[in-house]
């Protein structure tokens, strides 16, 4: 026993990293449990593809989606964390916050999966992050308004809430058009009958184009689900690595000399803009806002928290830090931490400026390009992290698909799903998730698919199983509040019990 205790004491980083990877692995596997049904339920139901083949291909496409999907959504979720916690993420508080987020998300997702109820991993994750925001504000005596970026949260909330509504309307409209068009002109096609009826009647019409459409849209859902949901896991694992191994992961040590030069050029460009518009900026940015942005950078000797010209001090500090640097490996851990904080603060300042009405559209685009160049140093993920998340999501897709698939196939409506309904729901989901992934917008694949199916049933007058719909809506409504409470409770307990 003493051996294990001493091993834990001297190798705590290794132990924590193993636990963190295990938690994230479980989270992504459960995510695969839930969302695999979105892609394969209808192609299995319509017998467009063999069950085992559909599951295998869905898992592979989820993997590829994570690997080639980029990182915009990963960091959109990360930046919902409190700014003071994000800037000092490599602390024990940061690690406790991440564990609380993961554990609350795992518990809720596992419960809903066991009950065969489709819920959103994105909603769970965002609810958990908001819970951390509230506890962080309370224990530090901060105003919650100063810690939460409401513009970002409203933006994410709107995408999560409006996407199912759009799915319902678009899928319903598609069914209406297919029903009207094919019933009047092409009655010989069997698009408006169910696969069950097709088999009973022993119809001989070709289903080739229907099956091809269903298979391709299913592949699209699988790929873009990986691109959208997989990124959230990548963001979480990067936060864990920064907490446990700051010397290796605070910034991208493998950044090329070319990219470092681009960062220096971006800093110089922002300084020129700031000097040209310094008076106008000071008139519109309040002292309180300046203090909130500069507060984490009090390690700089020339910072005066009572003045409004500290932005130039930060710019000069970053310029001096990057002077004659050809590789970030030349910086020590403290310098890496200071560079990360400085880049985040300048990025936040650009975000603040871009929301002012006085800023022209061309200047907003200028800020967007500058911010992208500056944050490329810290918005990254090693290939092994992406591979780990991709494998986790794929494994979840392959082993846990049956429960939620059964809900989609049999429990939403009182009548069998027609080919037209299946095509409409899958095309709507595939297009919505692909558009969101390419735009860097986090959405819930589960919610879009569920609402699309409900929309087709309403238009087709298939009849809905009210109990299942009621349970699903209740789960949707409760997901964010419950995950908030769970994460808040776990974070509070961890802060009080494990100092």
From Swiss-Prot:
Transmembrane segments: 4-26, 56-78, 98-117, 124-146, 156-178, 207-224, 234-253, 342-359, 379-401, 473-495
Pfam families reported for this sequence: PHO4 (PF01384)
Family statement: Belongs to the inorganic phosphate transporter (PiT) (TC 2.A.20) family. Pit subfamily.
Keywords associated with the record: Cell membrane, Membrane, Phosphate transport, Symport, Transmembrane, Transmembrane helix, Transport
Gene field: pit
Annotated catalysed reactions: phosphate(in) + H(+)(in) = phosphate(out) + H(+)(out)
Membrane topology: Multi-pass membrane protein
Localization, UniProt: Cell membrane
Gene Ontology, cellular component aspect: plasma membrane
GO BP term (any one): phosphate ion transmembrane transport
Protein name from the UniProt record: Low-affinity inorganic phosphate transporter
Role played: Low-affinity inorganic phosphate transporter.
Origin: domain of life: Bacteria
Principal subcellular localization: membrane
Gene Ontology MF: a single term: phosphate transmembrane transporter activity
């Amino acid at each position: 026993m003493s051996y294990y205790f001493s091993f834990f004491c001297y190798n705590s980083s290794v132990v924590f990293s193993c636990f963190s990877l295990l938690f994230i692995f479980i989270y992504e596997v459960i995510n695969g449990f839930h969302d695999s049904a979105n892609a394969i339920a209808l192609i299995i139901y319509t017998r467009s593809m063999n069950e085992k083949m559909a599951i295998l291909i869905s898992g592979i496409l989820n993997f590829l989606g994570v690997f080639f999907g980029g990182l915009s959504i990963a960091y959109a979720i990360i930046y919902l964390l409190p700014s003071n916690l994000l800037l000092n993420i490599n602390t024990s508080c940061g690690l406790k916050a991440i564990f609380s987020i993961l554990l609350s998300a795992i518990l809720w997702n596992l419960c809903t999966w066991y009950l065969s109820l489709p819920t959103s991993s994105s909603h769970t994750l965002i609810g958990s992050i908001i819970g951390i925001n509230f506890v962080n504000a309370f224990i530090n005596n901060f105003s919650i308004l100063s810690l939460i970026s409401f513009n970002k949260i409203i933006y994410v909330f709107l995408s999560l809430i409006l996407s199912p509504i759009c799915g319902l309307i678009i899928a319903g409209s598609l069914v209406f058009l297919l029903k009207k068009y094919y019933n009047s002109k092409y009655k010989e096609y069997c698009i408006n009958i169910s696969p069950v009826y097709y088999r009973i009647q022993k119809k001989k019409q070709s289903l080739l184009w229907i099956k091809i459409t269903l298979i391709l849209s299913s592949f699209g859902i699988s790929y873009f689900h990986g691109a959208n949901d997989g990124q959230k896991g990548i963001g979480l694992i990067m936060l864990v690595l920064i907490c446990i191994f700051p010397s290796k992961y605070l910034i991208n040590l493998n950044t090329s000399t070319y990219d470092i030069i681009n960062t220096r050029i971006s800093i110089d460009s922002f300084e020129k803009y700031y000097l040209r518009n310094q008076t106008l900026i000071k008139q519109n940015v309040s002292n309180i806002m300046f203090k909130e942005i500069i507060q984490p950078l009090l390690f700089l000797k020339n910072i005066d928290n009572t003045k409004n010209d500290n932005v130039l001090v930060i710019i000069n500090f970053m310029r001096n830090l990057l002077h004659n640097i050809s590789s970030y490996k030349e910086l020590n851990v403290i310098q890496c931490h200071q560079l990360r904080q400085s880049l985040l603060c300048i990025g936040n300042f650009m975000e603040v400026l871009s929301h002012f009405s006085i800023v022209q559209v061309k200047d907003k685009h200028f800020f967007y390009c500058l911010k992208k160049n500056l944050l490329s140093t810290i918005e990254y993920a090693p290939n092994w992290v992406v591979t780990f998340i991709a494998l986790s999501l794929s494994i979840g897709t392959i082993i846990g698909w049956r429960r939620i698939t059964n809900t989609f196939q049999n429990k939403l409506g009182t009548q069998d799903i027609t080919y037209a309904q299946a095509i409409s729901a899958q095309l709507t989901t595939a297009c919505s998730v692909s558009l969101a992934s390419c735009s860097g917008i986090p959405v819930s694949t589960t919610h879009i698919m569920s609402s699309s199916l409900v929309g087709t049933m309403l238009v087709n007058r298939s009849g809905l199983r009210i109990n299942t719909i009621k349970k699903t809506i209740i789960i949707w409504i409760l997901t964010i509040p419950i995950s908030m409470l769970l994460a808040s409770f776990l974070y509070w307990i961890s802060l009080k019990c494990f100092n």
